[in-house]
């Protein structure tokens, strides 16, 4: 986007200036929303880039949500896909504009020390502090370093990841989100959720743009996950 620069005669705020430029640039865009992360960096970014910037975000039902603004006009927009298995975790990074695979990596699941199968891990997370321990094992000890490896390989920073998709079994989904999975192993075997929408990287502590949506592949049973 190339924005008009403010003058003494044109004192429109930066946010409104960007919103008007974005509405003019995208067909079907009827409303523009800027995330807090974007607004915080907007003034400095616009002036350092002489008001010529690249934006990243989502356009849904006419509403453009701007998740980032940068003066680097060739900055890539990246998506991340992760398969969480009980033993192995695999991830890929994709260029969201071209579909190109830009990085791939695998690692062991950090939860393995708490049990080789989901039942033993549910038992472990049922102990005091267990939910947090199991979540940290998959998130902080596995996904964070795995994503760092992929970002280094792709030559990007994690804040260029604007969407992440995760597939795993029902128990792994609960443990990743820090949700008690004990009801899954107790008759009548009812999980807290099969699918969860609206979660961001900031909510979860996932290494990405803070407003990147984390998409969970929906599960279809207590022991049948979205990774089948």
Regions found by a protein language model. Name each.
Residues 1-81, 86, 98, 135-136, ...:
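Nucleotide/phosphate-binding catalytic cleft detector across ATP-hydrolyzing
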Residues 87-91, 101, 143:
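Extended, hydrophobic alpha-helical segments in both membrane/secreted and soluble proteins
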Residues 95-133:
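Short glycine-rich, Thr/Ser-proximal phosphate-binding strand/loop in the N-terminal lobe
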Residues 109, 169-172:
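Active-site-proximal loop/short-helix segments
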């Amino acid at each position: 986007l190339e924005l008009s620069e403010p003058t003494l005669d044109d004192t429109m705020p930066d946010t409104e200036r960007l919103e008007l430029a974005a509405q003019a640039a995208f067909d079907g865009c009827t409303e523009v929303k800027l995330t807090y992360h974007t607004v915080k960096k907007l003034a400095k970014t616009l002036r350092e880039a002489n008001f010529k910037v690249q934006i990243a975000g989502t356009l849904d039902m006419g509403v453009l949500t701007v998740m980032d603004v940068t003066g680097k006009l060739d900055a890539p927009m990246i998506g991340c896909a992760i398969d969480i298995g009980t033993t192995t975790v695999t991830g890929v990074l994709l260029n969201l504009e071209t579909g190109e695979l830009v990085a791939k990596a695998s690692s062991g699941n950090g939860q393995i020390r708490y049990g080789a199968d989901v039942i033993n891990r549910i038992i472990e997370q049922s102990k005091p502090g267990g939910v947090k321990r199991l979540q940290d094992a998959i998130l902080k000890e596995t996904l964070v370093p795995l994503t760092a490896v992929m970002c280094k390989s792709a030559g990007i920073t994690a804040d260029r990841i604007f969407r992440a998709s995760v597939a795993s079994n029902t128990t792994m989904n609960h443990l990743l989100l820090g949700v008690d999975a004990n009801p899954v192993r107790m008759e009548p075997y009812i999980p807290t959720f099969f699918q969860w929408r609206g979660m961001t990287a900031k909510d979860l502590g996932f290494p990405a743009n803070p407003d990147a949506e984390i998409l969970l592949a929906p599960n279809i049973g207590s022991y049948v996950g979205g990774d089948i």
